[in-house]
Amino acid sequence: MSGDTGTPNQGGTRYGSISSPPSPGPQQAPPGGTYLSEKIPIPDTESGAFSLRKLWAFTGPGFLMSIAFLDPGNIESDLQAGAVAGFKLLWVLLWATVLGLLCQRLAARLGVVTGKDLGEVCHLYYPKVPRTLLWLTIELAIVGSDMQEVIGTAIAFSLLSAGRIPLWGGVLITIVDTFFFLFLDNYGLRKLEAFFGFLITIMALTFGYEYVVARPAQGALLQGLFLPSCPGCGQPELLQAVGIVGAIIMPHNIYLHSSLVKSREVDRSRRADIREANMYFLIEATIALSVSFFINLFVMAVFGQAFYKQTNQAAFNICANSSLHDYATIFPRDNLTVAVDIYQGGVILGCLFGPAALYIWAVGLLAAGQSSTMTGTYAGQFVMEGFLKLRWSRFARVLLTRSCAIPPTVLLAVFRDLQDLSGLNDLLNVLQSLLLPFAVLPILTFTSMPALMQEFANGLVSKIITSSIMVLVCAVNLYFVISYVPSLPHPAYFSLVALLAAAYLGLTTYLVWTCLITQGATRLAHSSHQRFLYGLPGEDQEEGRTSG
């Protein structure tokens, strides 16, 4: 490795190079192409100087990644947290976003340094059984996220049509509208990224409008944001806190971001180019997640102001005395605390601030659902290609994901009601939190490997912070499961939970084990773990691809 940061490595070796031989059989581009079929060139500027031109060239992946922080699951989590705890959990939102940024920084760094995404690196380093289980957990997270997008979009259509489109009809519409967005690929990568930026702008304007008209108490808001406490909180507030973490730090998003950064032309044989790319991607991700944080803050603050400690009777009276009096019947006439969801949330905003607030809310919700649909499709495609080396078109990938997400959502929409859809949304947020270790542990493992990342491996401070995130998430998840299990409706469910818990703990234990090896606990390693210490030698790469 050359000591001159402006020159390539000796022999032109690429940093983190783990390129493996092509898979057996004929190789061809995936049908319909992929996001990565086009590379964005980076302009040459003065070495070492910050350049807005370069920042603009690197801008795109971070904003696409940030959409997962703004999907309907996040919106549901925000308003539920506001309604249940007022402003008390704003600090959880703030720190979850900061921790999310740290995880996304590691994902981007892995993609830049190695030239491979997290799924591809998992395929190379993990044995067959753990990587197959890992792939299944991430696919489960993607399907869960897609169900939230379907629910959010269906509710948006129902609100915009004043109830003329039933929920099950809105669910079916999502089958059609998804394919419309697949055609956007034909217009080029930068135009696609600009379109996502447009959808984020719509969300910022619509939810920002709701914040302005609701006028939350700024003193209480700032106290909830910067004082990490929750006086008088119990299990409902804990569930919302877990939901916030699961909605903000989504497992599949870490895999997605590590692949999106590969769309920029970075010379990985030059140390300075890699360092520069890492810097610009971090700046872009920070800007993008700052925008997403304020959008989530707008929603949580609005409902913390409008819904906290409100009763169903109070909500009924507000709507009955407004121009949207026909909606009043969705609130029972009792003195129980109102259980708000994204449908009732739009209605009560309309009752409080006029019909415009309802329709603006629905437009923002629609933008959240549609933008998340496309990024979820990309994540699914990248994960499948990385773990299984299967190249599908996005059309086929959307069919697979929606085939899993649509049927249960339609059944709930037809035979149950909004309460059940809202409850499903809450459980899906908790599911994301439970699956989070299967993204954070691998990214922490591989970005801590000097053999893979060389000088860009995690330092001591980064290891401590990221490991603390992992311990915190696992502790909160464990507390939630222990609290939730006694409430199971039938003893037969205990056997199923025990079986799932055994598989969950087994995979988590293996991932923690390999992670500790890369953190310096070399005594835990045996012969099958040598790759985590010394990387994949060139002559063993094919073995690394095929051996179990």
UniProtKB/Swiss-Prot annotation:
Keyword Transmembrane: yes
GO MF term (any one): metal cation:proton antiporter activity
Membrane topology summary: Multi-pass membrane protein
Signal peptide: none
Localization in the cell: Late endosome membrane; Lysosome membrane
Stretches the record annotates as Disordered: 1-38
Glycosylation sites noted in the Swiss-Prot or TrEMBL record: N321, N335
Side of membrane Extracellular, spans: 74-82, 161-164, 215-237, 305-346, 416-426, 486-493
Chain segments annotated as transmembrane: 56-73, 83-102, 140-160, 165-184, 194-214, 238-256, 285-304, 347-366, 398-415, 427-447, 464-485, 494-513
Pfam name, any one: Nramp
GO biological process, one term: manganese ion transport
Subcellular location, principal: membrane
Keyword Iron attributed: yes
CC per GO annotation: late endosome membrane; lysosomal membrane; phagocytic vesicle membrane; plasma membrane
Biased composition (Polar residues): 1-12
Catalytic activity line of the entry: Zn(2+)(in) + H(+)(out) = Zn(2+)(out) + H(+)(in); Fe(2+)(in) + H(+)(out) = Fe(2+)(out) + H(+)(in); Mn(2+)(in) + H(+)(out) = Mn(2+)(out) + H(+)(in)
Cross-referenced InterPro entries: NRAMP_fam
Domain of life: Eukaryota
Cytoplasmic side: 1-55, 103-139, 185-193, 257-284, 367-397, 448-463, 514-548
Keywords of the record: Endosome, Glycoprotein, Ion transport, Iron, Iron transport, Lysosome, Membrane, Transmembrane, Transmembrane helix, Transport
Family: Belongs to the NRAMP family.
Function: Macrophage-specific antiporter that fluxes metal ions in either direction against a proton gradient. Localized to late endosomal lysosomal membranes, delivers bivalent cations from the cytosol into these acidic compartments where they may directly affect antimicrobial activity. Involved in iron metabolism and host natural resistance to infection with intracellular parasites.
Protein name, entry field: Natural resistance-associated macrophage protein 1
Gene designation: SLC11A1
